[in-house]
Amino acid sequence: MHRRYFWLAVALAVLIVSATGYILAGNYLYAQYQTSLSSYTASCGALISWNPPTRLYTGLYVNAPSLVTIRYRSQTRQTLHISLSIPQFTKEDSADVTATSSFQQRAFKPQVLGSAALDALVGPGHSVAQLHLQVRSLNKVLCDTSASITLFSRQIMHWSDASGEDNSAYLAGWVTPNAPVIKDLVGRAAKRLDASPASYPATKAMHGYDAGRATPDDVRGQVDALLDTLQFDYGLHYGSDNIPFTPDATQLIQLPADILTQKAPIGMCVETTAILASAVERLGMFPYIIIVPGHAFLGVALDANSSAIDYWETSDLNGQTGSQANVDGQSEFRGSQNPRVIDIQYERQHGILPIE
């Protein structure tokens, strides 16, 4: 009899512990659910919830996967037409969805109207706009609301957000091989080759990897010619500036066209590197942007297999030749510790395209 009571007591204790654990786990999961739900801003009753951004860095946005995620539901099953736009900056992104009593979600990314919409922000630096959301049923508007959003110029690089997420891969968007100014740069470099063949003995033309026939010295000569053309034909000067690495840091970075159309062009390290990388990519070669604390410089694969990479230091635009910039770039890379390497070809394959 005593043994029976003992095992009953043990069983009861196990049940109590299990029930307590179940309740605690349930409370934790419910708290997590409430935390997740509270990150969204409810609007239009219980139909829609969203968490609209308050800032939009347009230079990054053109390559971002989405702008905002809309959560939707309906007490009765029905088709909803959801549309999102930033008037005078984007087109409308819309979708027809089937709403049920459970929340579902969809990401939206309205397409920018065009380069003129991006360029309009360059002068003022930023502008306050409205993010417009509308939800319709088959016969009426169910929800129409807006949220203020600050649009920042395409020249503003947001290196990392408040959570510390690294945005440096988006710098590949500043590499613009199809820009008319880059076509002009390559053409003027070709003229420099013709006018000064002794300065580039291994290079006969600006032909990239020349279907695998270009030697490493041929490739080096082409990059040297580009750098010399920037310095001696365009009068481009190097301006010192530090790349910030603190959370939520921003920096003004001009596109190649912004700089090369100036009467007295000047560019900091990341800007001059992006100009050269643009020309290198236009030639069908593979550029890299190397980022170390406070600085950036150029890397170029010496063949189509990227079996070897050489480096160029654009701070040498203040008086040194392209060949010396190559020497100094090699030295810079050897002395760097844990550099951030942005492989432009890789980023293209993963959806980071030129801003223009």
Residue ranges of model-derived segments:
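Short beta-strand elements
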Residues: 139-177
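Hydrophobic/aromatic-rich core segments of domains that either
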Residues: 266-345
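Short solvent-exposed strand-capping/beta-turn motif centered on an Asx-Ser/Thr pair
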Residues: 71-77
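Hydrophobic membrane-insertion alpha-helices, especially the h-region
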Residues: 8-23
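Intrinsically disordered, low-complexity Pro/Gly/Ser/Thr-rich segments with frequent PxxP/GP/PP motifs
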Residues: 81-128, 136-142
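Alpha-helical and coiled-coil interaction segments, frequently adjacent to or embedded
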Residues: 69-71, 82-87, 91-92, 139, ...
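Beta-sheet-dominated interaction scaffolds and their linkers
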Residues: 28-71
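Secondary-structure boundary elements
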Residues: 173-264, 306
